[in-house]
């Protein structure tokens, strides 16, 4: 290997130009260095001390033309060469290792393996590295096949830089797989070019050039992608690297990789598919990954055997963890009484939260460029009883208590961190006052103090978790396309010990296992000396005995300020007397600490301290052994009494309690018989307690009392242990003591620090525990853990018998039982604070190793089986059983299921008879045939086995756990199932706390009928009724915005703002219609595609428009004789005479001619430009597209046949009014006489309203009926809900009902209209996905430009990334036409508090009531419309109508519905033009406001993705300003009176229709 270690030599040695003729040269990096690579000989001149070079190449075959020769004669030639001598060659015997063959690595079977080359490539070879740009090639590594022969597709190579400049730094290894695209040969000639930057460094890029000469084709050996590998590996251009092939593939396989995603909603089903696509590939840290041709994530961490790697291979066993940098975080901050206490460092707990913890988290978020949306809620529980909480026993909580929740911020972007912190500090300052003061109306409205806040150990932690779970209870409601997951963070000042109710603990645990959200508990106090998190409860199955458990669904962290002195000792236990010593010393409370006297015989202070330590920690003598033996032999009753008192018997010094607590952890001490040594969170902190039932504060009271006083202290009334439990404890401890005495171990010194080591690290166990754990005990314990893991009895939590003395194996058992176990890399030490979980929360893994035993599945589970057959005609366009099985698996993953993949699953599958085959189990979906495959999936207490037999039949076998009988309720405990849990919640802008409108505890997660789901996916639409298909839904409104400078324009035309916006809506609908999903065998002709459905625009009254439409249809909904349907024989050409064409256009089969009203201007005998264009395409043989039709229409205008009604435009394809010139008007046409005045016209029932219809030309397809008119088919019997209350709509729409007054006395048959159209939209037109991505789009067919235009989306399992891309395209089109696409909630505003209790709301009452104010209570105005002033205020404040109330649709002769369902809105709803706020108008005239959080979050997230965030700060959506401005207008009498005066003046000038377009 001496020849392989080549270093740079002097630059004066150059090669002879004549000898190297025809060879290409690499331009030197510096002028004083020169390296020459010969293409013909494939040699590398790297220099040596003796003037030799390393020759890598072929002997007998020239490779100057890049020809790959795989003949056995080809060998790699490595030798020493002097420029004046010939080439020296030598070869080595060939040997090929079969170990390199790996099933997960795909290879081309047509490429023969080069035996000798593989042998030689297993050794390190030095090459010169070049770099290429991503625009040239996306491959990470490109290798010249002629330079390194023998490489073939599928080989795994390792590249290591020769970093001679930084010998102290370990070089990074790059693992990569040889692909067909990464090997360059003659067919893919590349040209190299050098680009010099400012620093003088050379960056080599590759560009394809088929016309280059031979000498420029192979002037490089290996090239890496410049970004990011050049910076990551710290490689300068033209540096040396070592290359070799990897034979032992298992040595480079990663155990766990972490992929970070941002600004994308990657659902769990796509995580599974994404992970499957990564199997068999190599990744490196900071590698950008693409999925479905979209940038999806970045690899951040790679682990193997507890070590972090730079690069590795992903195999099927690799755990792929996804972390989100754009998640929805909910902070639940427990403001228990400890939050106002001082810590040992002198800092108040809450100041520690707001001054150190939150700022540090925000700083990490900003440094990592995360885009989270956070919600912060303060909560606490107030004890309303007069009983001191210290008298409560373990596991007990006061029955009479009241819970408070205060919302600080709700779904706010972390970009506003400064405002968030200001609100947090303000709310903390007022929180205690607000919850303690209660107004007494019967006592003249005076405020009184009621109750006291409970400590964290007795707080409402589980209740707060249930309230948070309600936010994510329904997975179909998560339609945020920018945030991937939800995460809960509970901040508490306690130590991680909580007293809970058993039934509530059980229900909460089941809910947490049924959702895919994680919970992190952050404790602000010091870590205790017991296992955490620890939940303590009274177990009904054990007659109320105290039990401790560690749940499997949460993690815990202990925050410690890094600025504190690391050398400062902080006690883990808080003792009140020591804390207050020197501050409140008096005769009543006196703590005496004797001064330590140095012995006279001591030579030095160090020797004195050593002697003291020796005396304290001296070995246990025989007397103490006998004493323990006598105590263990005592009666059970005496043991129970000792356990309750827990006080020392001999030493009565004030500090004896501290010492006894330290020694109580010794297994052979007198307190070894006590089961639990816990830390209770007291009024002043956490206090150590050696007694099991004595409270912490009660023990503290005994510090300064005499022995006579100690006898007065009583234990709590409820006993924790029964006699049977005490006997078992005594028997077990006696056995442990006998094992210790029989071993006759040498006594050793017990150090204090051993008893205070944290149990958070499973590897650190005390030495005293080693004495207790003998070989037999270890063997039994390990066997017991394995048996417990084999037969899982409780997946919710692990019961802990002694939290302060837990064995290593028991800790491993509950760590293995978590659904989140796969996100933790093996052999990695976990930190005290899980910053990574706060910065980028992890998604629930798609796989789990948890699986019940065969015996449990046979006895504790019910069984059900059904088959699924594919319907060839299905909405999801599934074409094969292979695709159907994949969709069934992905839908389950989307709704929270995990794939069971472990040895236990294989064991169960092997035991199945008949047909059990563990080899057929799959973790990822096979790329080929799925016949014979089977997969197990689990969620909560449900397991599904999906299998496909070799005949192509799909079967689903479901195992459901049989519910056990409920335990009887303990006396004195609270039963949450029999009464609703109604806490008091105060949202962001509300002044007072109000009862919640939902029972958060008794509401369980949704359960789905999977048989119906699978049948629906298979194509059977009747499996689930349409009204029950509550899948993913999104609603968008199109609002008018400012016209941009680059707005849409037409040459030589001056369009108004309204005309530009109307044209934008038409183009938007055209874009949706052209994106319809059409099968390849169902393509329409180009002529038919040019005729698209049009929007029917109108102004004024909607019912006048619909009444006009109803007159053209009979009661059955059929078209009259003068239909627009054209016969097949009606075809014209452009040569038709103008007179004949005018006659045809005005005939019953021509274009629709009506009298139209637009903005109160009457246009007689006119038509629309877009309708005429569609008529031309349908009727003219020589017109096939809309452009030709528009040009022909312009020619008709130029020839004087038609004209614009106002002579402002030429002929345009759009919503423009045109009429005939006088000489071409039909002689039989007689204009109707117009009545003078708006009121008279309105009362004339025979007068047609402002009707504008859509084209009704035949399309010869399935959409014919829906394209004709908005009339709903008669066979669709839709009945609107009846509204019996006298609500707002009855008064608000009097002006509209009056338009029907003239016909109300006549009996008319009800006409049914559908005002929207549904389209199966293809969200993936470029076919990037492996399946059809279909979304159902509903858009309005009638629209008033002064209202909101609606677009609604519905889908089941479509990839959200494609939906987001489609929405972005629509939004860009809207912006160019002065429109804004805004996302709004699907449901109406008044229902949101039931979905999200933390959503901010504002209730407004007008400071002036126009109904009672003498100045505005004009009977003429209020009689016509009671809400006239309210609606004018809305219009004045830039609010547009969104939803009408249901009363508006309850007319006698017209029934209105939509393609997405029935309109059942209770109140009229309006949206601000910015999209930031939504307002509802109530019956009593009050206003109900709420921010449009989904739009605000989406907008701020998009702006945050731009690098220069500070520059864009002014562009951030600030909904609070909109609310404050509107609230000031409603609550300021002067401003509101001025608005109402203006409204009254306008009423006098105009009719009500002029002022009230916003109500139609």
Swiss-Prot record:
It is a peripheral membrane protein. GO terms for molecular function: GTPase activator activity. The keyword Membrane applies. CDD domains: DEP_DEPDC5-like. Residues 7-19, 631-649, 1247-1264 have a biased composition (Polar residues). Gene3D superfamilies: Winged helix-like DNA-binding domain superfamily/Winged helix DNA-binding domain. This is Vacuolar membrane-associated protein IML1. It comes from Debaryomyces hansenii (strain ATCC 36239 / CBS 767 / BCRC 21394 / JCM 1990 / NBRC 0083 / IGC 2968) (Yeast).
